[in-house]
Amino acid sequence: MKPKSKILIIAGSDSSGGAGIQADIKTVTALGGYAMTAVTAITAQNTTGVKSVVPIPPKEIEKQILFTSKDIKPDAIKIGMLHSPVVINSVIKSLQKIKTKKIILDPVMVAKGGFKLINDTAIKVLKEKLIKKVYLITPNIPEAEVLTKIKIQNFETVYTSSPSFLKLMKDLGANFEIQK
């Protein structure tokens, strides 16, 4: 029997269970993996929107990542909501210590109801420091627009802007990209 892949999920907690760490745990488990977590923020939200976001102190995020990884070495890391520059830098510092190669970034920026989950300074740090450390980035269309400053209006725009988007992602340091 093949051992389960061990996935460390670094993301915000969604109280409704439809996104964030809760959704990632469900996905990893459904695919036969073993999910470990480091919570970056606690949200009060439901299917209609986000009421509040309470950040976890960066040192606590580092402790979660390092202590979990010391016991169970992750085969891959999936990163979701990182809401501030301090948190992004804290996660980068932790990643350098655990040296897992397969890092997937879902650059969560805006909740479905339009609630902004990351500030402009954090977006800059994400682009300048974190993207170059990931194996795969998986932005949705609004996130891709923020990262590239390319407006995607319809399927044709997605198709025609893909080469520019891929070049921009490569320039930022990403190895692979899946647009969702």
In which residue ranges do the predicted regions lie?
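Conserved N-terminal subdomain of the carbohydrate kinase-like
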Residues: 2-9, 28-112
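Glycine/serine-rich anion-binding loops at beta->alpha junctions
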Residues: 7-29
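Active-site glycine-centered loops adjacent to acidic/histidine catalytic or metal-binding residues
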Residues: 12, 106, 140
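Glycine-rich anion/phosphate-binding loops
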Residues: 15-21, 82-92, 117-121
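Alpha-helical segments flanking ligand/cofactor-binding loops in enzyme cores
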Residues: 25-26, 89, 128, 163
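Flexible, glycine/proline-enriched loop segments at strand-loop-helix junctions
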Residues: 78-81, 111-118, 147-153
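Conserved phosphate/ATP/ADP-binding segment of small-molecule kinases
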Residues: 119-180
